Amino acid sequence: MKRTFQPSNLKRKRTHGFRARMKTLSGRKVIRNRRAKGRAKLAA
């Protein structure tokens, strides 16, 4: 059976990367919340 997680760095960056997050309002909220929490990594 094929597993659901088929890693691809390109897909990873395009969907969860910093620039992808900055494109949408909700994505910017994610970055803002992660900054407020003090995360070392803001995006993938």
Curated annotation (Swiss-Prot):
<dbReference type="InterPro" id="IPR020939">
    <property type="entry name" value="Ribosomal_bL34_CS"/>
</dbReference>
<comment type="similarity">
    <text>Belongs to the bacterial ribosomal protein bL34 family.</text>
</comment>
<keyword id="KW-0687">Ribonucleoprotein</keyword>
<protein>
    <recommendedName>
        <fullName>Large ribosomal subunit protein bL34</fullName>
    </recommendedName>
</protein>
<dbReference type="GO" id="GO:1990904">
    <property type="term" value="C:ribonucleoprotein complex"/>
</dbReference>
<dbReference type="InterPro" id="IPR000271">
    <property type="entry name" value="Ribosomal_bL34"/>
</dbReference>
<dbReference type="Pfam" id="PF00468">
    <property type="entry name" value="Ribosomal_L34"/>
</dbReference>
<dbReference type="GO" id="GO:0006412">
    <property type="term" value="P:translation"/>
</dbReference>
<dbReference type="GO" id="GO:0005840">
    <property type="term" value="C:ribosome"/>
</dbReference>
<keyword id="KW-0689">Ribosomal protein</keyword>
<dbReference type="GO" id="GO:0003735">
    <property type="term" value="F:structural constituent of ribosome"/>
</dbReference>
